[in-house]
Each structure stands twice: as structure tokens, then as C-alpha cells.
Curated annotation (Swiss-Prot):
Species for this entry: Delftia acidovorans (strain DSM 14801 / SPH-1)
Active site (record annotation): 12, 137
Pathway this chain belongs to: Isoprenoid biosynthesis; isopentenyl diphosphate biosynthesis via DXP pathway; isopentenyl diphosphate from 1-deoxy-D-xylulose 5-phosphate: step 3/6
Family designation: Belongs to the GHMP kinase family. IspE subfamily.
Binding positions (ATP): 95-105
GO molecular function: 4-(cytidine 5'-diphospho)-2-C-methyl-D-erythritol kinase activity; ATP binding
Nucleotide-binding as UniProt keyword: yes
Name of the protein in question: 4-diphosphocytidyl-2-C-methyl-D-erythritol kinase
NCBIfam families xref list: ispE
EC number: 2.7.1.148
Length: 287
């Protein structure tokens, strides 16, 4: 196999995000549902025989020289001893500093695609172990489904069968301004003692359950977040922030006119995915 083109890297929304504590090493403990969305970046992979990792921006958005895509490819080389290389073309559509997991999803799709392109035959669990060092959200994007996530992001329960999320459309708003995740988690006013919930609690009201504990801090640090939420609420929608922002979203329960949104905002109507588009590219370990 010489190439894999048009490989999707879907976004996620946090349907809720509760901070339940903080470890001695400073990492925050959370509970959340990460939901896959049909808004995605697209990656293209061409095998190289010289072992080099190269990357090309195809969308006009400047990318750092050592972003998560490159780091994921190098991590897979190092973990397996693979001597093959790759040239990666990136069509970047997902906004940065949005709380939608764009960089983490790119890294996960890179691991999945190179596992196939380089014929490594690693299992889903093996790739997730490699992904842990790339970022807390990367293992989720390898699990194959939307998921209930706990701990610092390492405890992942796919939402399948009886717990599968019902189909739903959403309006997603990304204000022009972004937010740095660390600035929110370091804020002295962040509440870190949310009571633990269960999947059964969440299942009683999939798209209305809980809250985002990071949202009050984000609204104070970046007023555009509150402005976007207020705009969606004025349309009689139930809006909240995803992740550490600055993107916000609301389930669509009616037809709405999006033309009144400020021109600098990125406004998009999306649907949830029933499974990751690359789910079947990985095999699960036998029990």
C-alpha cells in the first residue's frame, strides 16, 4: 500500500463536563460525554521509503512544525521500530482553540491511518497506549464511538447499543476569539468538586444533562463566549460551551435563521455520528 487519501478526523462536542477533583500532580479529574460530530479535517498519507516524516498544509492555515500530527507519526515509529516514513497532507477545517478536539482527532486519525499504511496491525488498545503520551483527548478518538469519559481522560466507556446517543442535529458557533486551556484550569475560581454522576443519570436526558464547569470561567476570561451563548439562547435554544471553549453549541429543536450571527463567527449546523468513520480500520483485542 502506497497511499491513503481523504482520511477524516472528526470533531467532538462535550455534552457536559464536570470537574470532580484534582490529583496531587495538578491534573484535574473529570466526567464528560465526548460526542463525535460530522465536522472534520481531512488528511492524506503517502508512504516514504526514507523514514522521514513530512507534512504539507493544504488549507492555507499555518500549522506548527511539530504539531500533534507529526508527533503521532514519530511516536508510532518509535513504539514499533517501523522504518517507513510518510508525507502527510492536511486539509484543516476544524477551528483551533475551540474545545472541539481538532488537534487530538488529527493525531488519532494519523495513528489509525499509519497503522494501516505501514501494515503494523496494532490493536485499538495498543494504539491507545501510544496515544496517552500525545494528549488526554487522543485515546478517545481511537475508541470508535462517542463515549463516557472519566479520570483525566483515560477511562473511556464507548456509548453503544443500549447507551448509544440518539441522532441529533446541532448548531455550533465558534467566536473569532480563542481560549487557552491552561488559563481556565489554573483559574482560582474554577469549581473542582462536582458530585459524581452515572451513565444512567446522563441517559435520562442526553442533550440536557449536567453543565460545563469550565464555562463560567471562560465567559469571564473571554466575553465572546457569553455573547455566543446568549445569542443561541435568544433563539430559544439550550446553549453551552464545549470543552474549554471557545466554541459553543445547542441541540436544534426547530428551524432557525442563522443570518443574524456576527460575521466574524464560524456558525455551522452539524449532526452527531453513530460511530467514528475509521472504527472498522482497527481490530479489538480478543477477550
Amino acid at each position: 500500500m502506497r497511499s491513503l487519501h481523504d482520511v477524516p478526523a472528526p470533531a467532538k462536542l462535550n455534552l457536559f463536563l464536570h470537574i470532580t477533583g484534582r490529583r496531587a500532580d495538578g491534573y484535574h479529574l473529570l466526567q464528560s460525554v465526548f460526542m463525535l460530530l460530522d465536522w472534520h479535517d481531512t488528511l492524506h498519507f503517502d508512504r516514504r521509503g526514507d523514514g522521514q516524516i513530512s507534512r504539507e498544509d493544504l488549507s492555507g492555515m499555518a500549522l506548527p512544525a511539530d504539531d500533534l500530527i507529526v508527533r503521532a507519526a514519530r511516536a508510532l515509529q518509535q513504539a514499533t521500530g517501523c522504518r517507513a516514513g510518510v508525507h502527510i497532507g492536511v486539509e484543516k477545517r476544524l477551528p483551533a482553540q475551540a474545545g472541539m478536539g481538532g488537534g487530538s482527532s488529527d493525531a488519532a486519525s494519523t495513528l489509525i491511518a499509519l497503522n494501516r499504511l505501514w501494515q503494523l496491525n496494532l490493536t485499538r488498545r495498543e494504539l491507545q497506549r501510544i496515544a496517552l503520551d500525545l494528549g488526554a483527548d487522543v485515546p478517545f478518538f481511537l475508541c470508535g464511538n462517542s463515549a463516557w469519559v472519566e479520570g483525566i481522560g483515560e477511562h473511556i466507556t464507548p456509548l453503544e447499543q443500549a447507551h448509544a446517543l440518539p441522532p441529533q442535529r446541532f448548531v455550533v458557533v465558534k467566536p473569532e476569539a480563542g481560549l487557552e486551556t491552561l488559563s481556565i484550569f489554573r483559574d482560582a475560581t474554577l469549581k473542582r468538586d462536582h458530585a459524581h454522576a452515572t451513565i444512567e443519570d446522563f441517559a435520562a436526558d442526553h442533550y440536557g444533562f449536567g453543565q460545563n464547569d469550565l464555562q463560567p470561567v471562560a465567559e469571564r476570561l473571554q466575553p465572546e463566549v457569553k455573547k455566543a451563548i446568549d445569542w443561541l439562547n435568544s433563539l430559544k435554544l439550550h446553549a453551552r460551551m464545549t470543552g474549554s471553549g471557545s466554541a459553543v453549541f445547542a441541540p436544534l429543536t426547530q428551524t432557525i435563521d442563522l443570518k443574524d450571527a456576527p460575521g466574524a463567527w464560524n456558525v455551522r449546523v452539524c449532526s452527531n455520528l453513530q460511530a467514528h468513520p475509521l472504527k472498522d480500520w482497527l481490530k479489538d483485542e480478543s477477550l
